[in-house]
Amino acid sequence: MKFFALFIYRPVATILLSVAITLCGILGFRMLPVAPLPQVDFPVIMVSASLPGASPETMASSVATPLERSLGRIAGVSEMTSSSSLGSTRIILQFDFDRDINGAARDVQAAINAAQSLLPSGMPSRPTYRKANPSDAPIMILTLTSDTYSQGELYDFASTQLAPTISQIDGVGDVDVGGSSLPAVRVGLNPQALFNQGVSLDDVRTAISNANVRKPQGALEDGTHRWQIQTNDELKTAAEYQPLIIHYNNGGAVRLGDVATVTDSVQDVRNAGMTNAKPAILLMIRKLPEANIIQTVDSIRAKLPELQETIPAAIDLQIAQDRSPTIRASLEEVEQTLIISVALVILVVFLFLRSGRATIIPAVAVPVSLIGTFAAMYLCGFSLNNLSLMALTIATGFVVDDAIVVLENIARHLEAGMKPLQAALQGTREVGFTVLSMSLSLVAVFLPLLLMGGLPGRLLREFAVTLSVAIGISLLVSLTLTPMMCGWMLKASKPREQKRLRGFGRMLVALQQGYGKSLKWGLNHTRLVGVVLLGTIALNIWLYISIPKTFFPEQDTGVLMGGIQADQSISFQAMRGKLQDFMKIIRDDPAVDNVTGFTGGSRVNSGMMFITLKPHDERSETAQQIIDRLRVKLAKEPGANLFLMAVQDIRVGGRQSNASYQYTLLSDDLAALREWEPKIRKKLATLPELADVNSDQQDNGAEMNLVYDRDTMARLGIDVQAANSLLNNAFGQRQISTIYQPMNQYKVVMEVDPRYTQDISALEKMFVINNEGKAIPLSYFAKWQPANAPLSVNHQGLSAASTISFNLPTGKSLSDASAAIDRAMTQLGVPSTVRGSFAGTAQVFQETMNSQVILIIAAIATVYIVLGILYESYVHPLTILSTLPSAGVGALLALELFNAPFSLIALIGIMLLIGIVKKNAIMMVDFALEAQRHGNLTPQEAIFQACLLRFRPIMMTTLAALFGALPLVLSGGDGSELRQPLGITIVGGLVMSQLLTLYTTPVVYLFFDRLRLRFSRKPKQTVTE
């Protein structure tokens, strides 16, 4: 009593307290960062190593395995995968959430150092690492194009000047440059000319290496001067290399230009990048795991004018893709939804109270509660994101509930003739415990979420804390500011209402009278009502089991990623043509705004595309509908497949794949894995629940297998090293010398001129100089035949692995796909030596599925404990919780009606309903208990009177919550995929709950009262609490 009086009789202090809360919230709002979702990125580090010319199997055994053994001993590694291809290995380390990325990086460097002695000596550089997830979509893609500069020169500008500067920007984790390679002097040898001159490829390599040497020469001094010695020991351009003497034949000089074509070119000619049909260099920028995407993008944009000044004017630097516009648009949509929710909630209050003066009170309480929450969000290190803003949108209906309960009860006393200040004090005292019970039990719902681990726990924590803080501030405001305003603003008389609102008042009275009559019938047919309640419980179980489920709603971020997978024996030239064909198909689609792509590198049969769609208001289709339309056109391209997927704000795991979800096969028997993977993949491709099924196992690449006749080699004076060196010199794009420039280092690359390697007969033109100086053709001591060989070798942990990727067809859920895969694996009878498990997002979905029911039960148990403590009763909390089954049925039926799968967002809605719908029961039970204690009424009379007396606030609070969530259902535009499931769940649950709990709660109350009396030692005592 004294607590409430302190604020009611000190209006200035109460107002200033509210102003202080609001000002703190405004300051917090201005400092909050912006993000699409809460920070849920796993710490990921990528380790890269190269050994030019080494086969995938050699890279896996000699490079990947030693590194994996060393890296696998690092604490906190939750997953380690590797992929080895021609000349390169990449190892992805995913760490636990609580592992600091910088500390993990230090451990990774130490592990690399420890494994260094076990790695091949021919590696051109030590393994390196990057603190970025290569499977994440770039947050920004920059392109460089020019009509005057070559691709190699553009790549040089990008890698030498732009990439290092961008990498230093806060939040940037990795800048990957693609589309070409660094400039180089390429030496294309003519094997027939070499044979005629009696010059071996090793002779050429040695001559070039010896002619381009950068060594210190020292200095000369006399008594007064000092001269530094400088020589012309370096060759820098193709023109300088052409006259180089590499051999003398019969006294005549053999120059490099006589036996080779020397050009200024690039290190690796098997790279290509394009943007909108124009050759381009791509800078793909990825953020650090803990970085804020909006802040990072803004920092990059601010740096672009300075970057443009560092490159020639003839080079066009453009932003080809930017993830931030759709994120900003999505947040703007949520903010608009929040404003609409506040307006609708206040409208509901006005319609029920029919007084502008009374409506002002909750109209003030709601903004104070919501704005004050921003201060707590800032102190907790949260961001303004879709989930936290949705929490505030839903909180609109919650925070007004407390004010409504207090206001309505005070207004009831005023209408009875009580003085305003006395009515404020008496009314607040009567419902103070009720409001406290409602708020604490609602916050209790989120305690299990706060204790939940893993990615779902991280994802939902900001939502739960934000909503809990808003409810806490609302509780404070409703017990301080609201009664004070009622006491000083409302009059001790029945408020005058406008004529146009009298009809609503009469309708509400008629509705209340009708409810009273139907409630009497329900209380006289308790068994029938009880059967209905039991039926809703059974229906809940059936609906939850049968409803399609997924991890997170599929988002339309306006960005697509595409992975090209061509025939494993395809040449680079043909692959570049496939890239151009696919890009043209994509570019011609009316919903596409920009297309960039690249191919080449160690995997010549693959490529990547990044597609920016037009804004939502300029297209009528969703991203998935566009993918479905393009899939039909892309299927007509022979010899290659382009797999498209919509970029999501949440992607788990470090695997780069061509689809959204992964299923990984593991085995310690590589032969068994290679035998069963094609069978499993073909089976999964036939399932209607899956689309775009593909695999990263590529073991059918074309190979030319050379078999040495060692006896003949010994007789001819040739060793294996010389033969292998010949092949590497001829076909390996061997880097044989380094050109040092002020800004970078460039290579001299030697190979047989591609004009002479168009078919297998090129091997017949190769020869080796034996120990007697004679030229011995390769065909004399070697035979060759075509064979198949892997293009890549993949590991997970230290086991051989193959990952099958898949997308979901329209109308199918992740639970459908998971069940179908499990059935297929059982039908195939896969041996125990091959183990299958879901990976990435699909793995997290499986884990979340297993914990959802436990989480809901934990929330109900927590609410029961809190209510039991508040009511000092084991029974009354059960009465209050009996409202939940009807809400669950309504939520699940609504999801089915809108064809929306049960996702993590829908789970949030269920958790919220646990907190919302019990408010009705709390108001009924509180007043019934009070009537029994002080009114000497029977339980049936007490609960009947409580239901009628609290009918108006029950309708007000329910409609306020419903209208607060309704804009989420009706919202469109960016980010609506996240908002709609939450709104659908809450609105459906509230409608069904309101229809049933007004009858089931009184019946359950009477049932437990009779049960209590039956087992009570004092059966004549009406109330035992």
Swiss-Prot record:
Keyword Cell membrane tagged: yes
Higher taxonomy: Bacteria, Pseudomonadati, Pseudomonadota, Gammaproteobacteria, Enterobacterales
Subunit-level organization: Part of a tripartite efflux system composed of MdtA, MdtB and MdtC. MdtC forms a heteromultimer with MdtB.
Designated name of the protein: Multidrug resistance protein MdtC
Function: The MdtABC tripartite complex confers resistance against novobiocin and deoxycholate.
Pfam families listed in its UniProt record: ACR_tran
GO cellular-component term (any): plasma membrane
Classification via InterPro entries: AcrB_DN_DC_subdom (IPR027463), Acrflvin-R (IPR001036), Multidrug-R_MdtC (IPR023931)
